[in-house]
C-alpha cells in the first residue's frame, strides 16, 4: 500500500533543493526550542549527573559520614587537568558501573576535556544537538525512501522535530539522542541495502559495520532494535531469493558486533547479568497476578508517555488517532486491496515491536527507554493520515494535515512541559551555609549534587532504617492503578530498589552525634530522603545535636500527583523533604 497516489505526487512535488532548505529550517527551529528549554532547565535527573561522573572522574565522595566541599563535588563531575582525554579512565568507570558501554561517555569526556574543571549542562547538551541534527536528517531520508515524496518526508520528519518527544530526547543529558541517531542510521542503511538486488557493494557493508559497532557501544537497546530491522531484511531477502545480499548483510553486522565485543568484552555479562530489564529482577515470592497486572499497568504507562510526547498529553487523542490509523489501514488493505510497500515494513515492524517489548521489559516506566522508537512512530502516524487524507477529493482540504501538525506543536509547547526541565525549586538559594544529607544505600544524594555545590560543605550519611510509610504509599498507588498487589508490593519495590546492585546497606547515623563540626553549627539545612525513616531521622538529630527547632524549606512531591510512579523520580528535584534545623 502506497501512502500517496500519483496525482498527489504531481500536485505536491517539491524539489530536492527546496526540501533541503526547509529541512534545515525545521532542524534549526527544533534545536532552538530545545535550547530555550535548556536555559530554563534547573535541576537534573540523577542519571544526567552520573553521565558526567562516569565520563570524567574517578573521584569518590565522602558518603558515609564525611564532609564534602563544592570543590569535591565539582571534581566528581568534571575533568581534572591531569585527566584530560584519559579514555582509560572512562573505560574503567564503565566496567565498574556495569550498566552501559563506553562510547557515549567517551564523547562526553572528549567535550569536557576541552573545558577542564568545568561542570556545565551545555557540554553534554552539545553532543545531543549534533546527534539530533543527524537523527532528523536520517529520519527525513528514511521517510523519503518509504514515501518517494519530499513533501511527505518533510511532514514526517517535521512532525517529530517539532514534538515534545524530540525536545525531551534532546534536553535529556544521556545517550538516547545518540542512540536514536545510530538506530535511524542502521534503519536507513538496511533499507538502502534492501533496494539493491544482488548488487550490494562492500562500501555500504563497511558503513553498516561501523554503524553497528558504534550503536552497540552506545546503548544495548541498539541490539534489540537492530535485530528487529535485521529480521525484516532477512524475511524479505529470503522471499526474494537474494541470498548473496543476505549473507553480506549478516556477515558485516556480525563484524560490527564482534568488534564491539572485542573493544568492550563486558557487553555479554552486562546484557545477560546487568541491571536492565525485568529479567534482572528477583521476582521470586511475588504472585503471578501481581506481575501480570503490573505489566498491564506498565503498558498503560507507556501509552501515557506516548500521549504526552506526541499527542498533547491527551490519551483520548492518541486512542482516536491510533483507531483511525488501524481502522483505515484495514480498509485500504482488505477493501481497497492495497498492500504496504516493503520498505515501510522496515519502519513499522521494528518500531512497534520494540515499543511494546520495552514497555513490558524495561526496568522502570520511563520515556527514555522508548525514545529511539519515537521518531519512526511519529512518522508512521503522519504517513497514516496522509493516506487517509488522500481520500479527500478537494486538494485544498489536504492542507489541514500540515496545518494541524504545526498547530498541535504550538499547543503542545504552550500547554505541556517536557520531562527533565525541573525548575520549580528554591533549593538553589541556600538558607544556611552548611548542609546535611540523610539517605539510604540507594545513593539518593547523587540527585542533589548540583544543589550541594551551593553550600560551603555538605555531610552525607546513610540510614539503614527505611521509610515506615513508603511501602504503604506504593501499595496504595499501585492498587489505585489496577495492580493486584496481594500485599506483595514491598517485594516488588525491593526488587527494583536493589536491581542489579552491589550496594551495601550501612548506617553512619552515629556521625551526626560524634562529628565536631556539625555539633558546632548554629543552623544547618537537612535533606531527608523519601526512602529513609524521616520521623526517626528528625528525632535522632534533635536528640544528638544542639539543634532544638526545625522548619520545612521545601516539601517533597506526593506519589498521588503522578499516574506513573517513575514520573515522581523524573519530576522531583531532590527525592527529599528539606528542612532548616536551628
Question: What are these regions, as identified by a protein language model?
Answer:
Residues 122, 139-162:
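Transmembrane-helix signature of polytopic, membrane-embedded enzymes
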Residues 179, 224, 319, 341, ...:
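Hydrophobic/aromatic-rich transmembrane helices and adjacent perimembrane loops
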Residues 24-27, 210, 254, 385-417:
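Signature aromatic-anchored transmembrane alpha helix within multi-pass, membrane-resident enzymes
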Amino acid at each position: 500500500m502506497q501512502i500517496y497516489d500519483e496525482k498527489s505526487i504531481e500536485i505536491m512535488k517539491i524539489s530536492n533543493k527546496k526540501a533541503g532548505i526547509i529541512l534545515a529550517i525545521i532542524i534549526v527551529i527544533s534545536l532552538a526550542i530545545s535550547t530555550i528549554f535548556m536555559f530554563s532547565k534547573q535541576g537534573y535527573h540523577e542519571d544526567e549527573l552520573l553521565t558526567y561522573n562516569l565520563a570524567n572522574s574517578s573521584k569518590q565522595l565522602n558518603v558515609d559520614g564525611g564532609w564534602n566541599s563544592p570543590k569535591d563535588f565539582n571534581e566528581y563531575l568534571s575533568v581534572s587537568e591531569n585527566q584530560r582525554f584519559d579514555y582509560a579512565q572512562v573505560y574503567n568507570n564503565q566496567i565498574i558501573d556495569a550498566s552501559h558501554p563506553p562510547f557515549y561517555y567517551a564523547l562526553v569526556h572528549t567535550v569536557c576535556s576541552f573545558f577542564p574543571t568545568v561542570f556545565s549542562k551545555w557540554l553534554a547538551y552539545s553532543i545531543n544537538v549534533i546527534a539530533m541534527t543527524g537523527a532528523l536528517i536520517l529520519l527525513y531520508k528514511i521517510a523519503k525512501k518509504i514515501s518517494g515524496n519530499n513533501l511527505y518526508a518533510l511532514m514526517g520528519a517535521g512532525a517529530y522535530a517539532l514534538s515534545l518527544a524530540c525536545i525531551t530526547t534532546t534536553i535529556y543529558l544521556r545517550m538516547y539522542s545518540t542512540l536514536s541517531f545510530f538506530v535511524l542510521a542502521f534503519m536507513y542503511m538496511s533499507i538502502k541495502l534492501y533496494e539493491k538486488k544482488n548488487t550490494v557493494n562492500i562500501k555500504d557493508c563497511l558503513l553498516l559495520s561501523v554503524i553497528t559497532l558504534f550503536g552497540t557501544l552506545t546503548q544495548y537497546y541498539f541490539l534489540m532494535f537492530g535485530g528487529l530491522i535485521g529480521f525484516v531484511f532477512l524475511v524479505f531477502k529470503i522471499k526474494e531469493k537474494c541470498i548473496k545480499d543476505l549473507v553480506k548483510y549478516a556477515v558485516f553486522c556480525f563484524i560490527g558486533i564482534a568488534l564491539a565485543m572485542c573493544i568492550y568484552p563486558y557487553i555479554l555479562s552486562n546484557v545477560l547479568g546487568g541491571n536492565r530489564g525485568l529479567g534482572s529482577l528477583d521476582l521470586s515470592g511475588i504472585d503471578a497476578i501481581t506481575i501480570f497486572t503490573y505489566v498491564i499497568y506498565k503498558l498503560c504507562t507507556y501509552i501515557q508517555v506516548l500521549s504526552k510526547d506526541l499527542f498533547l498529553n491527551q490519551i483520548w487523542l492518541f486512542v482516536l488517532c491510533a483507531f483511525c490509523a488501524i481502522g483505515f489501514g484495514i480498509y485500504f488493505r482488505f477493501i481497497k486491496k492495497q498492500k504496504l510497500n516493503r520498505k515501510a515494513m522496515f519502519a513499522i515492524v521494528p518500531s512497534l515491536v520494540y515499543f511494546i517489548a520495552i514497555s513490558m521489559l524495561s526496568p522502570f516506566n520511563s520515556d527514555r527507554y522508548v525514545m529511539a522508537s519515537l521518531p519512526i512512530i511519529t512518522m508512521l502516524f503522519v504517513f497514516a493520515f496522509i493516506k487517509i487524507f488522500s481520500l479527500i477529493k478537494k486538494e485544498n482540504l489536504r492542507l489541514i494535515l500540515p496545518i494541524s501538525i504545526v498547530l498541535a506543536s504550538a499547543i503542545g509547547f504552550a500547554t505541556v512541559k517536557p520531562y527533565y526541565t525541573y525548575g520549580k525549586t528554591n533549593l538553589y538559594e541556600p538558607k544556611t551555609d552548611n548542609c546535611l544529607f540523610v539517605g539510604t544505600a540507594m545513593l539518593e544524594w547523587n540527585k542533589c549534587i548540583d544543589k550541594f555545590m551551593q553550600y560551603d560543605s555538605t555531610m552525607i550519611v546513610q540510614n539503614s532504617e527505611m521509610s515506615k510509610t513508603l511501602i504503604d504509599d506504593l501499595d496504595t498507588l499501585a492498587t489505585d492503578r489496577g495492580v493486584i498487589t496481594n500485599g506483595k508490593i514491598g517485594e516488588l519495590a525491593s526488587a527494583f530498589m536493589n536491581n542489579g546492585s552491589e550496594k551495601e546497606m550501612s548506617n553512619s547515623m552515629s556521625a551526626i552525634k560524634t562529628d565536631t563540626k556539625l555539633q558546632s553549627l548554629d543552623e544547618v539545612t537537612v535533606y531527608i530522603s523519601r526512602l529513609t525513616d524521616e520521623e526517626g531521622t528528625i528525632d535522632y538529630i534533635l536528640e544528638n545535636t544542639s539543634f532544638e527547632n526545625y522548619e520545612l524549606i521545601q516539601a517533597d512531591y506526593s506519589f498521588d500527583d503522578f499516574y506513573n510512579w517513575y514520573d515522581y523520580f523524573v519530576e522531583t528535584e531532590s527525592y527529599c523533604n528539606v528542612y532548616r534545623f536551628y
